[in-house]
Amino acid sequence: MVKKILGQCYIWLILILMYLPILVLIVFSFTEATNVGTWTGFSWNLYPRLFQDAQIMTALGNTLILAFVSAAVSTVLGTLGAIGAFYSKKRTRKAIDSVTQIPIVNAEIVMALSLTVMFVFLSTYVFKAQLLSFWTLLIGHVVLSLPFVYISVKPKLEQMDPSLYEAAIDLGATPRQALTKVILPETLPGIFSGFLLAITLSLDDFIVTRFTRGAGLLSGDSQIETLSTLVQAKIKKGPIPVEMRALTTIIFLIVVLAVVLISIRRHYVDKKHAQGRVRG
């Protein structure tokens, strides 16, 4: 009984430590106080002010475009890489798995510096032109996210019967049909998880963005600004803009809504599969 109570207390303590700062931020998004901790009265004004701030809206647009494009590219490459490794020889598969683990455990600053050195070398000795741009930033985010997509898809492939592909080919399907009709549907939950994880990594990233960014995508500025780099730049000059509290609240609520919808859909799919097994 005592162990059960202590276990529940420990779980609640972890949850409080995780979500209390977010709840404080949400509460103070409804006041115009400059400093968190000083309540100057309830107000919605931060939310309309957020959408009137051109600098924040540009950074938000850059961040979302970068996140979704890099996630899409990472998902395609990571999924194809996982499928290719799954159907490779055992030694080749182990080698690919090991290589894929390195960027995950490696320090992000090492990856960022390596990409920067590579882009500078190519700019100086190969293309003879400035390369740092939105495209180099996109490459950096794809390199950052791709291994996580790979490890999200890989378990779903391992749960699948490896003979399904050969069976589809034997029944007259082309390799492309076997991939799209058999392999991809079986791995779709892992692909979707990898896609969401890639979006999260891109939205959250600062180090790779700081080292590989170039000209702005939406504003044409000398350097593209994302939310992470904008916050860092604002901190150097003074306090974080109060409108950021409203923005982070909106992002958090969208994430919560997405998680709830995904959980409902997963419950519905699992229930449907269970009913199908009972009928079978």
Task: Please report, for each region that a protein language model flagged, where it lies by residue.
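Transmembrane alpha-helices
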Residues: 10, 15-22, 150-153, 160-162, ...
